[in-house]
């Protein structure tokens, strides 16, 4: 009984082994790797750009940072006015 079960299993395993790697598992040759390089670099650049924009938007929306930016703007404006009135 064991022999009857193991023979079909052995045949299937041998067929899979002799078939070779699946197309997804095959290693790409060097020329195809260089052909895809510009696409991959562009995709990487776009991803990096999106992440940078999201980080900048996140920083802009933080309340403490908005208050700090407003305070610096107001202080700089007051300093500018004071210097203008002092030297005019």
Curated annotation (Swiss-Prot):
Listed InterPro entries: ApoC-1_sf, ApoC-I
Originating gene: APOC1
RNA-binding found in the keyword field: no
Signal peptide: 1-26
A Pfam family that the UniProt record links to this protein: ApoC-I
Protein name: Apolipoprotein C-I
Family per record: Belongs to the apolipoprotein C1 family.
Cited Gene3D superfamilies: Apolipoprotein C-I (4.10.260.30)
């Amino acid at each position: 009984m064991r022999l009857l079960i193991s023979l079909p299993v052995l045949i299937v395993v041998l067929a899979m082994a002799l078939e070779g790697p699946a197309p997804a598992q095959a290693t790409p040759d060097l020329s195809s790797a260089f052909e895809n390089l510009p696409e991959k670099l562009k995709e990487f650049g776009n991803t990096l750009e999106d992440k940078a924009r999201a980080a900048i938007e996140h920083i802009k929306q933080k309340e403490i940072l908005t208050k700090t930016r407003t305070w610096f703007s107001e202080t700089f404006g007051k300093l500018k006015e004071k210097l203008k009135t002092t030297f005019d």
